[in-house]
Amino acid sequence: MSNSETTSIMQEVKPEKPWINRKQSLREVARPLFIATLISVAIVLVTGLAGPLGFYVAFVLSFIVVSFVDGMRHDKVKAIDKVMTTLITAGFATAFIPWASILLTVFKRGASAIYFGFFTNDMSVTAADDDLGMGGLSHALVGSLLILLMASLVAIPFGIITAVYITEIKGKFSGVVRVVVQSMSGVPSVVAGLFIYAIVVSRYSFSGLAGALALAILMLPTVARTSEEVLKLVPEDLRSSAYALGASQTATTFRIVLPTARSGLITASMLGLARVAGETAPLILTAYYSAVYSLKVTGQPLASLPMYIFQNFSTGTDTALTRAWGGAAVLLSFIFILFIFARIAGRGSRK
């Protein structure tokens, strides 16, 4: 065989790369889906499984069986791979469908309540049966922002200081502090509300400040634990280099470690805010509810978005329920924005 013939054969034969997933053709993907759909329809008709949930269960089970049989045409490893891929996809869909259903339900039912005045008016002169074109949640939106701002001023500094003590100072009580913080993460929100009610509200009155203190108790462990994990990601070489240059532990912490972890600490703060933004139980016992716009955070009740939703649902009229759904849509949007900021800050942390 000549050199030219050998070269041409080598050019035609391409080396296989089994570590790279081969793209499946449309036919390979559509065939199992089509067969599983037919089997699912037959199962639903025969067994009487009702509704989309019954069809979904039948489809997942059918698709697992069909994927295994289809994979056995090649080999056992291929069959197991197809089954595991199906299980992972089904798990993702099972988690995603309820979440998407909640969002669609909230925004669909609350859409009719949302208009421009919904964000500029309060409920001071609006009754429960008044038209949806009257009233709004500006008082609740402003109240929530005030309560969350005050809670952040308490929880974020203390949470970061706690994380610094655990990861940087590593005092003899750091283990105890870590256990306490972890235990606080499991405290029911109503317990935090009862605690502030007994200490503050019973002696003075319902107020936005009392609500902020209750939310700060719930927010602090989230900020502390997330900040601890962020500070652990700071390379040890940075600390060693600072100490080698003669920097003290305080200077190293505040000039090297914290600036390096700044984006991650912002993420921790945003996650803490998102954790408490929708809490209702502690606000029932602390801030309560007011139908009027107010910036006063002491001496009187202060409205908030969770309490606005709760109050309208408790009223029970059709228009009040629609306003509650509208408030829920605004609250979900607010929390979604917080998570977007957390993700953006997290990218900076990874860099």
Model-predicted segments: where are they?
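Periplasmic/extracellular loop-to-transmembrane helix junction in inner-membrane transport proteins
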Residues: 12-15, 19-22, 44-50, 71-90, ...
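Transmembrane alpha-helix signature in integral membrane proteins
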Residues: 52-62, 134-164
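C-terminal transmembrane helix and the adjacent membrane-cytosol boundary/short C-terminal tail
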Residues: 67, 231-232, 267-270, 311-351
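Transmembrane-helix boundary motif in ABC transporter permease subunits
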Residues: 69-77, 151-181, 194, 343-347
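Generic hydrophobic transmembrane alpha-helix motif, especially the helices
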Residues: 182-215
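Transmembrane alpha-helices
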Residues: 249-287
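Interhelical loop and adjacent transmembrane-helix boundary motif
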Residues: 283-332
